[in-house]
Design a protein with these regions (language model features):
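Short, exposed beta-strand "edge-strand" segments with a Pro/Gly-rich flavor and a Y/T-containing core
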Residues: 5, 44, 72-74
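C-terminal structural segments of small proteins and small subunits
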Residues: 48-74
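A short beta-strand micro-motif
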Residues: 7-10
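Generic non-transmembrane alpha-helical segments
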Residues: 19-22, 26-28, 56, 60-64
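Short, Lys/Arg-enriched, disordered terminal segments
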Residues: 1-3
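Amphipathic, hydrophobic secondary-structure cores in small proteins
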Residues: 13, 17, 22, 29-49
Length: 74
């Protein structure tokens, strides 16, 4: 993954796994990683993606009603 990436923080592990599956079906380069130490979460994993795909990720999450805490640029 490129240096310019963002992460989606979720409330649950199941939401993170579902988001990963949906994003991969949409042909986006994503992966689940541990939540960075400087960010907090109820869930220990987050979805990493290229920052250029932020709008697409937000659309996928909204269309599929996947709840998330926040999106952070890293």
């Amino acid at each position: 993954m490129k240096d310019n990436y963002s992460v989606v923080i979720f409330y649950s592990t199941s939401a993170a796994i579902r988001a990963e599956s949906l994003a991969k079906r949409g042909k986006l380069a994503v992966k689940l990683i541990p939540v960075p130490r400087n960010l907090s979460s109820d869930c220990g994993i987050c979805l990493q993606f290229n920052s250029a795909d932020k709008q697409k990720i937000e659309e996928i999450l909204k269309e599929n009603k996947v709840e998330y805490e926040n999106i952070y640029g890293i």
